[in-house]
Curated annotation (Swiss-Prot):
GO molecular function, one term: arginine-tRNA ligase activity
GO cellular component term of the entry, any: cytoplasm
Domain of life from the UniProt record: Bacteria
Protein name, entry field: Arginine--tRNA ligase
Organism: Escherichia coli (strain 55989 / EAEC)
SMART domains: Arg_tRNA_synt_N, DALR_1
Any Pfam family hit: tRNA-synt_1d
Catalytic reaction(s) noted: tRNA(Arg) + L-arginine + ATP = L-arginyl-tRNA(Arg) + AMP + diphosphate
The organism's taxonomic lineage, starting at the top: Bacteria, Pseudomonadati, Pseudomonadota, Gammaproteobacteria, Enterobacterales
Designated gene of the protein: argS
Alphabetized HAMAP family for the sequence: Arg_tRNA_synth (MF_00123)
Amino acid sequence: MNIQALLSEKVRQAMIAAGAPADCEPQVRQSAKVQFGDYQANGMMAVAKKLGMAPRQLAEQVLTHLDLNGIASKVEIAGPGFINIFLDPAFLAEHVQQALASDRLGVATPEKQTIVVDYSAPNVAKEMHVGHLRSTIIGDAAVRTLEFLGHKVIRANHVGDWGTQFGMLIAWLEKQQQENAGEMELADLEGFYRDAKKHYDEDEEFAERARNYVVKLQSGDEYFREMWRKLVDITMTQNQITYDRLNVTLTRDDVMGESLYNPMLPGIVADLKAKGLAVESEGATVVFLDEFKNKEGEPMGVIIQKKDGGYLYTTTDIACAKYRYETLHADRVLYYIDSRQHQHLMQAWAIVRKAGYVPESVPLEHHMFGMMLGKDGKPFKTRAGGTVKLADLLDEALERARRLVAEKNPDMPADELEKLANSVGIGAVKYADLSKNRTTDYIFDWDNMLAFEGNTAPYMQYAYTRVLSVFRKAEINEEQLAAAPVIIREDREAQLAARLLQFEETLTVVAREGTPHVMCAYLYDLAGLFSGFYEHCPILSAENEEVRNSRLKLAQLTAKTLKLGLDTLGIETVERM
């Protein structure tokens, strides 16, 4: 049930009847304050200006045509021409009933699309670090939301699995007689990488061998391909452990590494030349883009093939976008890549559009994000100033949550405590990130994220258990409760019901904008409204069974909404804390 969409259409029709153009925007929004109703239509200002009349005068005319019978109990004009809409308690009650009767809580299924989501993208032969956290969990929240809404989602884990480093690694493994790379731990491999790089920089004979190995690998030599596959296997096996710990939905089947696009690159360069988009410049192949200027104000040159014949990330990204449209049949492509890559992506996509590889009707969206910072406001590092490994961060989260949970539950069995600590610890790390607007940097703070107050995972998980505790005490007959009507008489009942029915609107925003913090804010607000409702509207000691059952149903929908909302974020709920 999308009340905002329903009201928008009703107000738009009334505006047209009052003389507004057919493309008018009613600008129906959820009201910020309770005294302004549940929704506000703010579109009169812009339209009245076009019509040469006062906004309030237009609002009055719109009201004469606005039929919200059975939806709103009151509609009033406020200020210079805002229309405040107060939802009818009977309308709220009816739709709470419908939401409870639906597995999807009344959420409609939009027109199905094929959506490719590019996220996580770690590098082969390196362990995942905290820099991979945001892309991995924000992208996964988007995937979960889009899948819940009914879209066909293709996860694309664009791992860095190609390049000169593989010549180095294979040469060094061979030198160390470590051909059986499949038995190595990734931690070993990182050490190997450092040693290989040192030798590459200091030993010209070794560097030459490494360069030869790259050529052999790229030409398809089976021995070198097999060594390369082993390196990829070790890395992705290790990464899968991290994905599972993080409760993200990525699997090995979702890996679409850079190597996938290699066979396409010569053809793309040739095609761009044939179309007159790419030219030779100082031995390299370059596309000049009018949309991007260099310091001299001239069109910027984007290199797609180096003088030595090598390709660049831009070339791969052009091939990647083409593949996602032509082979995966994407209707929409979302890239969860940090903000530093924005210009690079815009340049690649400008070439993609000019070449006609992806039509304008298929959006390519960079859902960029800021950095994770330490308390000092600088990029998050270890005490020694090194990069924080993601596995180490999750270990610390688990340890801190274990202490927190044990303190509150000294008698809890060890296995139960471990499971709870895992849900709380991992949930805290994820929620702390997801609850921030992804476009901004944020401060990573253990104390804040593990607090039981404020917009945190422990608070949300506790809020859920609090609702469940009502049902444990109530000794409910499920059939009787299902048949009982919902009756809304108190203001707090109405406020809670209205917010519950805004779940679909929230999902729609997250799906459109890729902003999971909007879901976090909604769930936090919902938990707060339930708390006020619980305090002022007795449930178990209600004046009669009819009111008791009705309030139990509001509590039931609250629990279901909190659980489903947290699930779209990849946050586990718990039965008790």
